[in-house]
């Protein structure tokens, strides 16, 4: 092979030369070279549609007896199938980003960069300082001023990533606790949970109450959670929903058991990063402020409530706050312990609104709620891109919004000759299921008509048993059946016996009914005109006008009259043998 890579069309031509019309391999070396070239070639969907290499490779895979070649071809077809189907393409990107060191912040999630809320650049040193806040309890109070300044920047219209602080601070931002929506149904795994019940519940005295065993078992760690890499170069970018920060928030959850802190009010707004679950969240948000589940009692809230933000949450903004989603905790609040929110310290006067805590202004939440209602088509398109990690509520039922879509064996691809594109066969399956119905009705009507005709005549009358008995296949079958019956010791006569008896009876009845077809014998003549007497005028009139057997013609046994100028066809023996008699007289 040359140094320059061959085009897909050239590789297709080589493959066609190496196989015959039935996809049998004639040149194994050439086929292996084409497979190797295709494994290294970054082929596109358009090239596959133009060359139809997938069909050729699949036909070769089916016909070949070389197991190694079949495995390589199947692996190649799988990679092409993932290229064509977006679902598989998304999963491949997710695996690649999870394994790469420089892209640990999860670029496989479908973020919407056109939304108004954009994350400010975050330095590695800043991130490390925030991790130090979690590790060193003694330094927490020293950094309240810096947190205040960051909160002021967010209120002034400079949205930045909401910082992660420990649970012991007076203003705990707990972005990794996900409460159930107030109607009791688990939310989508892509939603950013509101900071409620992340580390248990608080009693009236501010002390932390341990969550029940039910609540402990209801949490689920994502499958793709990895340990954070603070030195990763990808951390300098605006964060998106990623794997690294999930694990970082898991560590923060474990440390939260040591430092009690008041949670947010229940009505604090929830944020989400992905528009794919806006449909579910939109329906949940309508019931959230008016409906309370059975085990939850609306407790008195002594803290001041910001207007239009605290109790009425915004219905899932499509804009993505920079903080990525982390471990989900589906913990219902403790119904018996009313939550008391202490007065906030003087250092945090601007962080009272939960919309500011979530990282966006109330204006952006209103705009995002409008975008939610108009983004129904986007949510339908993105509905398939669900993550693998799903949440379980307290009853043990899988959350409806987080269920991975069931993909049956419907991803068989086909080539549409009209559009010349490769597409799945899912839309044609119900048509196929319905199509046999009219085809079944047509034979039924024909069969009914045939049955009506057959009922008029007996099947014995329609069957030519004589010809059937002379058939070699029938005779061999009957003899085989008789031999089987005799070998098995059966005393009853076989089918050939009944057939022979029937044919004998039929033959005798036919012979009895059949008569020979001959001429009538002439009586001995006593009156011979011209010999015994003279010819008279009456004799002449009889010859010309009347039938005179033996004189001007003859008669057969069936009553037919023949003159001497006609051919006579007889059956003298009654065995269908014909005796043809030529005319006695030929008149010119």
Swiss-Prot record:
Q: Which residues carry this modification: Phosphoserine?
A: 435, 458
> GO terms for biological process?
positive regulation of transcription elongation by RNA polymerase II; positive regulation of transcription initiation by RNA polymerase II; regulation of transcription by RNA polymerase II; RNA polymerase II preinitiation complex assembly
Q: Where is the TFIIS N-terminal domain?
A: 10-87
Output a single Gene Ontology CC term carried by this record. Answer: mediator complex
What this protein is reported to do is described as:
Component of the Mediator complex, a coactivator involved in the regulated transcription of nearly all RNA polymerase II-dependent genes. Mediator functions as a bridge to convey information from gene-specific regulatory proteins to the basal RNA polymerase II transcription machinery. Mediator is recruited to promoters by direct interactions with regulatory proteins and serves as a scaffold for the assembly of a functional pre-initiation complex with RNA polymerase II and the general transcription factors.
Compositional bias, Polar residues, is annotated for 179-191
Family in the record: Belongs to the Mediator complex subunit 26 family.
Give the start-end ranges of region Disordered.
112-393, 412-441
Localization recorded for this chain is: Nucleus
Keyword Signal listed: no
Q: Does the keyword Transmembrane helix apply?
A: no
Instruction: Write out the GO MF terms.
Output: transcription coregulator activity
Bias (Pro residues) occurs at 314-325
* Entries under SMART domains matching the protein: TFS2N (SM00509)
On assembly, the entry states: Component of the Mediator complex, which is composed of MED1, MED4, MED6, MED7, MED8, MED9, MED10, MED11, MED12, MED13, MED13L, MED14, MED15, MED16, MED17, MED18, MED19, MED20, MED21, MED22, MED23, MED24, MED25, MED26, MED27, MED29, MED30, MED31, CCNC, CDK8 and CDC2L6/CDK11. The MED12, MED13, CCNC and CDK8 subunits form a distinct module termed the CDK8 module. Mediator containing the CDK8 module is less active than Mediator lacking this module in supporting transcriptional activation.
Name of the molecule in the record: Mediator of RNA polymerase II transcription subunit 26
Q: Which Pfam families match?
A: Med26, Med26_C, Med26_M
Q: Organism, per UniProt?
A: Mus musculus (Mouse)
Compositionally biased tracts (Basic and acidic residues): 123-133, 207-218
For this UniProt record, give its keywords in alphabetical order, as a comma-separated list.
Activator, Nucleus, Phosphoprotein, Transcription, Transcription regulation
